[in-house]
Amino acid sequence: GVPCRCDSDGPSVHGNTLSGTVWVGSCASGWHKCNTEHNIFHECCKE
């Protein structure tokens, strides 16, 4: 999957570890949205 930044990863600075995964639509069952950004077409999720 495509990595994305969770709030727990810290500020969006180049070089930070991206612990989330982009899901089109909403997060898969058993996953949760991990940031507060509002995206219409995808969510940043983690297990």
Swiss-Prot record:
InterPro entries xrefs: Myo_ane_neurotoxin_sf (IPR023355)
Keyword Phosphoprotein: no
Subcellular location: Secreted; Nematocyst
GO cellular component assignments: extracellular region; nematocyst
PTM annotation (Hydroxyproline): residues: 3
Record-level Gene Ontology MF annotations: sodium channel regulator activity; toxin activity
Coarse class of the protein's main subcellular location: secreted
Keywords of the record: Disulfide bond, Hydroxylation, Ion channel impairing toxin, Nematocyst, Neurotoxin, Secreted, Toxin, Voltage-gated sodium channel impairing toxin
Positions of disulphide bridges: 4-44, 6-34, 27-45
Record's function text: Binds voltage-dependently at site 3 of sodium channels (Nav) and inhibits the inactivation, thereby blocking neuronal transmission.
Family: Belongs to the sea anemone sodium channel inhibitory toxin family. Type I subfamily.
Protein name from the UniProt record: Delta-actitoxin-Cgg1b
Lineage of the organism: Eukaryota, Metazoa, Cnidaria, Anthozoa, Hexacorallia
